[in-house]
Amino acid sequence: MSDAYLALETGDVVEATARAPGMARGELVFTTAYTGYEESLTDPSYEAQVLTFAYPLIGNYGVRPERTESDRVHPSAVVARELTDDVADWLRTEGVPAVDGIDTRDLVLDIRDGGAMQVGIAAGPDASPATARAQLADCPRLSARTEIGAHVSVDTAETHGNGDTTVALVDCGAKRSIIDAFVARGATVHRLPYDATPADIAAVDPDLLFISNGPGDPANFDAAEHLVDEYIGTVPIAGICLGQQIVARALGGDTEKMDFGHRGVNQPVLDHDSGRVVMTTQNHGYTVADPGDLTVTQVNVNDGTPEALDSAPLDVLTRQYHPEANPGPHDTRGFFDDVLAMADASYTPATAD
């Protein structure tokens, strides 16, 4: 083990222990999830971010490839109070810097009180406060990463499943479990690149246009926004997380960056129609500020931000949280049944996962 340093945007430099060497920079964020570290670390929505785990011990049930949400680790670096050797070895193999041995409660409070901030990390034998500060100096804002979609999307189209309902899934950084949720309910999913064209959508003749989750600023996903504008009123449209934000922007709404976002597996959401509160998995740093032509049907109990946007006349259903969970509670997996029913009135929902 060797030295590591975190240079914060506040001007502070925090000393830590290097568990996987390297230099990194990104937006410093935290998750309050106490399980599901395999899924979180492979969630494309964490691209270009430095992920801090609020829970003090990460790795106490090993690393299982079958639990991953993509083919690689996506955070630029990982920060924890304590990482097990299994997780540290995995991150080292992936080439992702990792540090521990610090009180992450202090970092979480800094982010909560001051908002998400940029950070530079230096870990390993050549690390110093100066090298960490150099990483910070070169760190672009998340909104400036205009090509982030290219780093998390498929390059060419893929097909999953062989069901009766056809879903055109625009991959802006999709989690594997979202695709699995559709396939388990009898759908054929055409996974298309983030910059898919209207012609690409037309080629698969979908019953449903789905905009996936993903990282970064929704304003940087013009191609997906154009698809919504092109197909609204013609094909039912759904989206999750970043997808909700993109759909709202396409339909006259707007988005904004949050102070520190929602990242965890216990975010309470209130449904206006039923009065029911459900626990949800969330991972986002932007939110819908103006829903445009859509109606807000669910809100976050903690801060009132929109968690669901619907329009029966336009055949639109979106969710800011992750109904597929992985990790997290399964309270809202019925969303996939709802959107498939919207796409095909004759569709019979499969048994819930």
Curated annotation (Swiss-Prot):
Gene Ontology CC terms, in alphabetical order: carbamoyl-phosphate synthase complex; cytoplasm
InterPro entries, A to Z: Anth_synth/Amidotransfase, CarbamoylP_synth_ssu, CarbamoylP_synth_ssu_N, CarbP_synth_ssu_N_sf, Class_I_gatase-like, CPSase_GATase1, GATASE
Superkingdom, taxonomy of origin: Archaea
Pathway noted in the entry: Amino-acid biosynthesis; L-arginine biosynthesis; carbamoyl phosphate from bicarbonate: step 1/1; Pyrimidine metabolism; UMP biosynthesis via de novo pathway; (S)-dihydroorotate from bicarbonate: step 1/3
Catalytic activity from the UniProt record: hydrogencarbonate + L-glutamine + 2 ATP + H2O = carbamoyl phosphate + L-glutamate + 2 ADP + phosphate + 2 H(+)
Ranges of residues in domain Glutamine amidotransferase type-1: 166-349
Entry EC no(s): 6.3.5.5
Sites where the protein binds L-glutamine: 45, 214, 216, 242, 245, 283, 285-286
One Pfam short name: GATase
PROSITE patterns: GATASE_TYPE_1 (PS51273)
Region of interest called CPSase, as start-end residue ranges on this chain: 1-166
Keywords linked to the UniProt accession: Amino-acid biosynthesis, Arginine biosynthesis, ATP-binding, Glutamine amidotransferase, Ligase, Nucleotide-binding, Pyrimidine biosynthesis
CDD domains tied to this protein: GATase1_CPSase (cd01744)
Molecular function via GO: ATP binding; carbamoyl-phosphate synthase (glutamine-hydrolyzing) activity; glutaminase activity
Top enzyme class: ligase
Positions annotated as active site in the UniProt record: 241, 322, 324
GO BP of this protein: 'de novo' pyrimidine nucleobase biosynthetic process; 'de novo' UMP biosynthetic process; glutamine metabolic process; L-arginine biosynthetic process
Subunit structure as annotated in this protein's UniProt entry: Composed of two chains; the small (or glutamine) chain promotes the hydrolysis of glutamine to ammonia, which is used by the large (or ammonia) chain to synthesize carbamoyl phosphate. Tetramer of heterodimers (alpha,beta)4.
Function, as annotated: Small subunit of the glutamine-dependent carbamoyl phosphate synthetase (CPSase). CPSase catalyzes the formation of carbamoyl phosphate from the ammonia moiety of glutamine, carbonate, and phosphate donated by ATP, constituting the first step of 2 biosynthetic pathways, one leading to arginine and/or urea and the other to pyrimidine nucleotides. The small subunit (glutamine amidotransferase) binds and cleaves glutamine to supply the large subunit with the substrate ammonia.
NCBIfam families: CPSaseIIsmall, PRK12838.1
Family: Belongs to the CarA family.
The protein's name in its UniProt record: Carbamoyl phosphate synthase small chain
Designated gene of the protein: carA
